[in-house]
């Protein structure tokens, strides 16, 4: 038996634009129903199944609440898998990557918290813009190749955002 569709687990349609509050509400509701405390006196098989179901729900929730992971999952559902470390054949984006990394490195070297906050805001705006572009591409089956390119960009910005959070933590110490 294959893994259940992440969207179906939460009774949602497979689409990029997801109401994250509703997703969170459904997740909490479903995860309560398989909480280990509810199965403390149940046979071992039922306990194991509840634990597996909780793990499936958690995996689905983590995927759907993250825009880059949700976008990649949608591509996968449609039979279009990106290599884990897909090379970007986009010189403009490669240049942008180098510029962003250089800017982050300068912020790290200067320990500029205000600069990091500004960089983080700019990064969030860029992520929101890409998410909007992906949503538009996703709704048009003729633009799936463009959607793949945008997923790669989303993944890069998501990784960069993680690095910014780590830098903030180091500078706060």
UniProtKB/Swiss-Prot annotation:
Please report the stretch or stretches of sequence annotated as the J domain. Answer: 5-77
One Gene Ontology molecular-function label:
ATPase activator activity
User: What does the UniProt keyword field contain?
Assistant: Chaperone
What InterPro entries would the database entry show? Answer: DnaJ_domain, HscB, HscB_C_sf, HscB_oligo_C, J_dom_sf
Query: What domain of life does the native source organism fall in?
Result: Bacteria
Write down the Pfam families for this protein, in alphabetical order.
DnaJ, HSCB_C
Membrane-crossing residue ranges in chain numbering: none
The record ties this protein, via SUPFAM superfamilies, to: Chaperone J-domain (SSF46565), HSC20 (HSCB), C-terminal oligomerisation domain (SSF47144)
Q: Name one GO biological process term.
A: protein complex oligomerization
- PROSITE patterns linked: DNAJ_2
Q: Does the keyword Membrane apply?
A: no
Q: Is Chaperone included in the keywords of this UniProt record?
A: yes
- Cellular component per GO, a single term: iron-sulfur cluster transfer complex
Describe its partners and assembly state.
Interacts with HscA and stimulates its ATPase activity.
Q: What is the purpose of this protein?
A: Co-chaperone involved in the maturation of iron-sulfur cluster-containing proteins. Seems to help targeting proteins to be folded toward HscA.
Family stated for the protein in its record: Belongs to the HscB family.
NCBIfam families, per the entry: hscB (TIGR00714), PRK00294.1 (NF001420)
For this entry, the protein name equals Co-chaperone protein HscB homolog
Origin organism of this chain?
Pseudomonas paraeruginosa (strain DSM 24068 / PA7) (Pseudomonas aeruginosa (strain PA7))
Q: Which gene encodes it?
A: hscB
């Amino acid at each position: 038996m294959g893994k259940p569709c992440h969207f179906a687990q939460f009774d949602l349609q497979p689409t990029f634009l997801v109401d994250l509050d509703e997703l969170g509400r459904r997740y909490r509701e479903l995860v309560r129903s398989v909480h280990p405390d509810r199965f403390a006196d149940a046979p071992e098989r039922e306990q194991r199944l509840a634990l597996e179901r909780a793990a499936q729900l958690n995996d689905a929730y983590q995927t759907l609440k993250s825009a880059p992971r949700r976008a990649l999952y949608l591509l996968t559902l449609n039979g279009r898998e990106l290599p884990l470390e897909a090379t970007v054949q986009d010189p403009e984006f490669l240049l942008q990557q180098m510029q962003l990394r250089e800017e982050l490195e300068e912020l790290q070297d200067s320990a500029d918290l205000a600069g990091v906050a500004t960089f983080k805001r700019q990064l969030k705006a860029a992520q929101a813009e890409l998410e909007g572009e992906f949503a538009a591409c996703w709704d048009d089956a003729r633009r799936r190749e463009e959607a793949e390119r945008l997923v790669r960009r989303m993944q890069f910005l998501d990784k960069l955002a993680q690095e910014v959070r780590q830098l903030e933590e180091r500078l706060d110490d």
